[in-house]
């Protein structure tokens, strides 16, 4: 668990290549699911990319549109690059594919390797190991990525709900 201000939260960081498609969609989906479950205050959620070519830019237009059609607002997010400090700060650093996981192992302190996981590991029913990059593809590619992302975020939230509920019980009333 990570200390953010006065509260302890569960830190989740979603990782893709440029932080303009998959990882911001995952951030938006998870935030929305946690909010609907009444657990948002238990989480610190962010996303980043392994590549720095789009830093400061908003998500891809089709990523914004696909997410919005399912009720997830990601329009205000901006791309950033992951750094070693992120791996220290976040409890779960979730890679959208095996290449990202390998990249993260180059920058992560060895003692924190257990924080690095494939995102799809949270959806045991998924046949996908990687969330395919929809960038440059048609809307259907973004929808397919979102199907995997929503299922993975649902599994992640279910896995972390007992811990999140415990954290919320321990936090002082506002």
Predicted segments with their positions:
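Helix N-cap/beta->alpha junction signal
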Residues: 23, 97-98
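Phosphate-binding/catalytic loops
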Residues: 92, 98-174
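Conserved active-site segments centered on acidic
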Residues: 2-89, 158-169, 174
């Amino acid at each position: 668990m990570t200390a953010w201000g006065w509260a302890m939260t569960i830190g989740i960081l979603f990782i893709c290549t440029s932080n303009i498609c998959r990882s911001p969609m995952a951030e938006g989906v998870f935030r929305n699911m946690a909010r609907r479950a009444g657990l948002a205050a238990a989480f610190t959620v962010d996303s980043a990319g392994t590549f720095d070519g789009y830093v400061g830019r908003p998500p891809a237009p089709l990523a914004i549109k696909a997410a919005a059609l399912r009720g997830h607002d990601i329009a205000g997010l901006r791309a950033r690059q992951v750094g070693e400090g992120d791996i220290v700060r976040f409890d779960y650093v979730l890679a959208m594919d095996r290449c990202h996981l390998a990249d993260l192992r180059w920058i992560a302190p060895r003692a924190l390797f257990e924080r690095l996981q494939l995102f799809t590991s949270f959806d045991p029913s998924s046949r996908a190991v990687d969330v395919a990059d929809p960038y440059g593809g048609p809307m259907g590619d973004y929808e397919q990525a979102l199907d995997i992302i929503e299922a993975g975020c649902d599994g992640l939230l279910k896995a972390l709900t007992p811990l999140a509920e415990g954290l919320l019980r321990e936090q002082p009333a506002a």
